Structures are given as structure tokens and as C-alpha cells.
């Protein structure tokens, strides 16, 4: 891993056709060791993991090893890891399972939907926040549209960008079945208070149990946090945790951690078929990608502190250079006082009526980045709803650019892209 940190200040010209990638929150390249693990599995473990011959047994061993690697990365147990196609499936699986569990509990108590009065509430209630990924927000909105569930979208603080624990607790109803809050926001990098939410919900569940009310489960989407900071399910206290491989230099598959899967915590399949993953997620396992995911998890377990320290150093240097170059015109949208954030994320705006974020990036010759979440790239001319939710003024949010550095980003590359941004601004409005 290249962790070079030296870079000269001053005027730096980028070689022709040189590109500097700073969109690591959108996706990451595969580490060489991950590519090797994927390739070896393709060559040597091509058999069906459910088969008894050598290639099949080797595939099964690779899957079991990867499961253990993921568990180690998050401080959980291997039997609590379910492989999925990615974060979207994992998040949908949590929501689907919670709805099913709610209705089964109602049936067991002899309270079918048509027996319960509207006042008592017949639909499961979810609590989430206003800055969640679309793979949480859209499934929940779909359930509301179909009158299958009720959802409270708790706003984040306009002071610190975090969801407030007390606001989560105040939203709990007798029919609440799930609180789902991301661990770290993909646009601002703000770390959410998941441990405190879990602790308070656990205490509340003891009171609810005495009244015969359903247990409130806690889920966090850890896509942005993994590989950038230590993530431990025991510290977080969650029932579900979403894992996304391509955010930590792994392949584009994922996994779901479920505490005591099927016993302590309910999980219901969305698909039915061959019975793989203990019937929770059937379908012949994608052995090569699982091998790569396991190797990526190993690298995180071994090097997380090194990765974190390097990214923080580079990100801080980036913000210093931006402030030095653009002075009072720069607005650091992801820097909230007293709030922890991801070590690699810098969301900023250069103030000026001609400096919309997408316009600035279009003029850049070297920088590869985005204005916000890549899944919203078709709405790049609109201010980010996440930034607006965090209290960023509309005129500032319109100009936002999200830079996210990676494991091998250097100070020299930072110097290049700051100069690139400067020339882009000059192109749009003349010299600063």
C-alpha cells in the first residue's frame, strides 16, 4: 500500500491526461490481494459448494473462511454472517424480515390484522432518519404507499448533522419494530450515535416486554464506515449490520450480520430455492466474489488503524490546502464542531453564483469526484437533500463537491487537484 505523504506546496501542473480519483465513498478499486483471491477461486474452486467432490469442498472451505473473516472484521460470530448480493439486498432483507416478524407476532398473540382496531395500530412502524441511503428510504416509502407499514423519518440536527438519540426515542410507538440508522453518512462523513441508540432501545425493550409489546430491533448500514474505522457489533449493540464489499476495496457483493440469526433475531428469506445460506438467502454461492470479500475483510482487520491514520492525514491536508487557496470563499460542509466524522471525507463548497458543484467538476481536467451520492448523479443540478437536512444553506449546498480520499491518495495528488479546482473556478468566473 502506498502511503506516501509528501507533496510540495505551490503551483503544481498536472501531466496531460493525468487523473486523480477522489470518489472513494462511491466505490473503491480492488486490492491486488483481493484480485488474487478472486482469480484463484475461479481457477481452483469452481465446483458447486454443495457438492462432495474436491472442487466443491474447496469452494465450501473458501466460503467458510470468508465468513470467519467478515465476522472477525466486525467482532461478530461466523454463524451470524449471511452473504448477499450487496448493501441494497441486505437492507431490503432487514426491512422485509421485520415486517414478517411483526405480523407473525400479531398472529401468535391471536391479534390478526382484521381483529385489531385502527386505534390499536395494525401496521408495523419503522424509525429512520432523513439522510439515509435510498436502499433504506425507498423500500420504507414503498411500504407506506402500499399501506403495509408506517414510517417516521427523524430529521438530523441542523447544528451537528447527527440524528439525536432523544428524537429517536420520542418517535417510538407501541407498534415500532425497527430503528434503522446508518453508521456514517456517505456525503458528510458524520458518525451517528448508534451505540447510544442501541443502549437506550435495549432498556426500552425491557419495559415493552412487560406490556406485551413487540421488541424494537436496531439495524445500522455500515457501508461507509467499514475499512475507514473500527466497527464492532458488540460495541454498537445492533441486531443487524449491513456490509458492502466495494466500499472497502472488495468485490461488489455484500453480507448481513444478524445477531443470533433466526433465534435471537428474526430473519425471513425474500427468495426461495436451493437452501443455501441456511435457507435465509438461497442461490448457489458466488464463490470467487465471496473469496475476494473475505480477503478484503482480512486486510481491514490487519490494517484498519493504518488506513484510518493515512486517510485522516490526507483529508486534513486537503482541507488546509482548500482554505489556503480559496480563503473565505470555501465552506467546509462536513466539518461540524464536536462531531466525529469519517477520516476520508471532505464535502465543501466554493461560494460564487457560477460555481455549482457539477459545473466546477465539469471544468476539472484532473479531478475525478462527484457532487454527492453517486446514486443521485442524475440530479446533480439540485442541492443535496442531505446537506439541506444538515442545515447547509441552499446557495451553499448547490455548490457542493464531495471529495473522499483513499488508502493510496498522496499529498502530491491533493496539490494537483487543488490547482485543478483553481483553474476550473478561473474558467467559470475569471481569476479568484
Swiss-Prot record:
Biological processes, Gene Ontology terms: lipid metabolic process; negative regulation of cellular response to oxidative stress; response to insulin; selenium compound metabolic process; selenocysteine catabolic process
Modification N6-(pyridoxal phosphate)lysine, positions: 247
UniProt EC number: 4.4.1.16
Xref: InterPro entries: Aminotrans_V_dom, Cysteine_dSase, PyrdxlP-dep_Trfase, PyrdxlP-dep_Trfase_major, PyrdxlP-dep_Trfase_small
Record's function text: Catalyzes the decomposition of L-selenocysteine to L-alanine and elemental selenium.
GO molecular function: amino acid binding; protein homodimerization activity; selenocysteine lyase activity; transferase activity; vitamin B6 binding
Compartments it resides in: Cytoplasm, Cytosol
Post-translational modification Phosphoserine, affected residues: 117
Family label: Belongs to the class-V pyridoxal-phosphate-dependent aminotransferase family.
Keyword annotations of the record: Acetylation, Cytoplasm, Lyase, Phosphoprotein, Pyridoxal phosphate, Transferase
Residue positions where N-acetylmethionine is found in the record: 1
Protein name in the entry: Selenocysteine lyase
Amino acid at each position: 500500500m502506498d502511503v506516501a505523504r509528501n507533496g510540495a506546496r505551490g503551483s503544481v501542473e498536472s501531466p496531460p491526461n493525468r487523473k486523480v480519483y477522489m470518489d472513494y465513498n462511491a466505490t473503491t478499486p480492488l486490492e491486488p490481494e483481493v484480485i488474487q483471491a478472486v482469480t484463484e477461486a475461479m481457477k481452483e474452486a469452481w465446483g458447486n459448494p454443495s457438492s462432495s467432490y474436491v472442487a466443491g469442498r474447496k469452494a465450501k472451505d473458501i466460503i467458510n473462511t470468508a465468513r470467519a473473516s467478515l465476522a472477525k472484521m466486525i467482532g461478530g460470530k461466523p454463524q451470524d454472517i449471511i452473504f448477499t448480493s450487496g448493501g441494497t439486498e441486505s437492507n431490503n432483507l432487514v426491512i422485509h424480515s421485520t415486517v414478517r416478524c411483526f405480523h407473525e407476532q400479531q398472529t401468535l398473540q391471536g391479534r390478526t390484522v382484521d381483529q385489531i382496531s385502527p386505534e390499536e395500530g395494525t401496521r408495523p412502524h419503522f424509525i429512520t432518519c432523513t439522510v439515509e441511503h435510498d436502499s433504506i428510504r425507498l423500500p420504507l416509502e414503498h411500504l407506506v404507499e402500499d399501506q403495509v407499514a408506517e414510517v417516521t423519518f427523524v430529521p438530523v440536527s441542523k447544528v451537528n448533522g447527527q440524528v439525536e438519540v432523544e428524537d429517536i426515542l420520542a418517535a417510538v410507538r407501541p407498534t415500532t419494530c425497527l430503528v434503522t440508522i446508518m453508521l456514517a453518512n456517505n456525503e458528510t462523513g458524520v458518525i451517528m450515535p448508534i451505540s447510544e441508540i442501541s443502549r437506550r432501545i435495549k432498556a426500552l425493550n425491557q419495559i415493552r416486554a412487560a406490556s406485551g409489546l413487540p421488541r424494537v430491533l436496531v439495524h445500522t448500514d455500515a457501508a461507509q464506515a467499514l475499512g475507514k474505522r473500527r466497527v464492532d457489533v458488540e460495541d454498537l449493540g445492533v441486531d443487524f449490520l449491513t456490509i458492502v464489499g466495494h466500499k472497502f476495496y472488495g468485490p461488489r457483493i455484500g453480507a448481513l450480520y444478524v445477531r443470533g440469526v433466526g433465534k435471537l433475531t428474526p430473519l425471513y428469506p425474500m427468495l426461495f430455492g436451493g437452501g443455501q445460506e441456511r435457507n435465509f438467502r438461497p442461490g448457489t454461492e458466488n464463490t470467487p466474489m465471496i473469496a475476494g470479500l473475505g480477503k478484503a475483510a482480512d486486510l481491514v482487520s490487519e490494517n484498519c488503524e493504518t488506513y484510518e491514520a493515512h486517510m485522516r492525514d490526507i483529508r486534513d491536508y486537503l482541507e488546509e490546502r482548500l482554505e489556503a487557496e480559496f480563503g473565505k470563499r470555501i465552506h467546509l460542509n462536513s466539518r461540524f464542531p464536536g462531531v466525529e466524522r469519517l477520516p476520508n471525507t471532505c464535502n465543501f463548497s466554493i461560494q460564487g453564483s457560477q460555481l455549482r458543484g457539477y459545473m466546477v467538476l465539469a471544468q476539472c481536467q484532473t479531478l475525478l469526484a462527484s457532487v454527492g451520492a453517486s446514486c443521485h448523479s442524475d440530479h446533480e443540478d439540485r442541492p443535496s437533500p442531505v446537506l439541506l437536512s444538515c442545515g447547509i444553506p441552499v446557495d451553499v449546498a448547490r455548490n457542493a463537491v464531495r471529495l473522499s480520499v483513499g488508502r493510496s491518495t498522496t499529498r502530491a495528488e491533493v496539490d494537483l487537484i487543488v490547482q485543478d479546482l483553481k483553474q476550473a473556478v478561473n474558467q467559470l468566473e475569471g481569476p479568484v
